[in-house]
From Swiss-Prot:
A Gene Ontology term for the protein's cellular component: mitochondrial large ribosomal subunit
UniProt keywords, alphabetically: Chaperone, Mitochondrion, Ribonucleoprotein, Ribosomal protein, RNA-binding, Transit peptide, Transport
Assembly, per entry: Component of the mitochondrial large ribosomal subunit (mt-LSU). Mature mammalian 55S mitochondrial ribosomes consist of a small (28S) and a large (39S) subunit. The 28S small subunit contains a 12S ribosomal RNA (12S mt-rRNA) and 30 different proteins. The 39S large subunit contains a 16S rRNA (16S mt-rRNA), a copy of mitochondrial valine transfer RNA (mt-tRNA(Val)), which plays an integral structural role, and 52 different proteins.
Biological role: Together with thiosulfate sulfurtransferase (TST), acts as a mitochondrial import factor for the cytosolic 5S rRNA. The precursor form shows RNA chaperone activity; is able to fold the 5S rRNA into an import-competent conformation that is recognized by rhodanese (TST). Both the cytoplasmic and mitochondrial forms are able to bind to the helix IV-loop D in the gamma domain of the 5S rRNA.
Protein name: Large ribosomal subunit protein uL18m
Stored PANTHER family: 39S RIBOSOMAL PROTEIN L18, MITOCHONDRIAL, LARGE RIBOSOMAL SUBUNIT PROTEIN UL18M
A Pfam family that the UniProt record links to this protein: Ribosomal_L18p
Origin species: Homo sapiens
Taxonomic lineage from the root: Eukaryota, Metazoa, Chordata, Craniata, Vertebrata
């Protein structure tokens, strides 16, 4: 009963002379005429408002903090990879220049933890690298800076995390800023 009333309602609407559907039309003229004048589209606005703040980063034009040469780790980045290793867990964060965490992965997460034998060893670091690389690509972050301390860079677990990130498609080096 409900289908019948809906059908007749649609049928009566389509029988109106003002209703133009391509499937029901037998004429060869287009169903709708464009209302916008194409000459009007060629005018360029004198001011440009950037509504996407990431656009400047992707074009390598955005500002980087350059006055922190004597500080370690350097503050000259748009996105930075931070790895935090505790007694029981490994956590990797992607931090934006303003200090906010954009993407993170940790062995505290149950979805990662249930696949690991240990939440601290080399395999855990490699798994965190794979998961974080996938999440970064899903978030649109392809480049980031990784500045490990010398003793972190020498460890096998950090080397495996770096290789998992690069194999996942993330470049651990940001492009140079264009100053012109």
């Amino acid at each position: 009963m409900a289908l019948r009333s809906r059908f007749w309602g649609l049928f009566s609407v389509c029988r109106n002379p003002g209703c133009r559907f391509a499937a029901l039309s037998t004429s060869s003229e287009p169903a709708a005429k464009p209302e916008v004048d194409p000459v009007e589209n060629e005018a360029v606005a004198p001011e440009f408002t950037n509504r996407n703040p990431r656009n400047l980063e992707l074009l390598s034009v955005a500002r980087k903090e350059r006055g922190w040469r004597t500080v370690f780790p350097s503050r000259e980045f748009w996105h930075r990879l931070r790895v935090i290793r505790t007694q029981h867990h490994v956590e990797a964060l992607v931090e934006h220049q303003n200090g906010k965490v954009v993407v993170s992965a940790s062995t505290r997460e149950w979805a990662i933890k249930k696949h690991l034998y240990s939440t601290r060893n080399v395999v855990a670091c490699e798994s965190i690298g794979r998961v974080l690389a996938q999440r970064c690509l899903e978030a649109g972050i392809n480049f980031m800076v990784y500045q490990p301390t010398p003793w972190e860079a020498a460890s096998d677990s950090m080397k495996r995390l770096q290789s998992a990130m690069t194999e996942g498609g993330v470049v651990l080096r940001e492009p140079q800023r264009i100053y012109e």
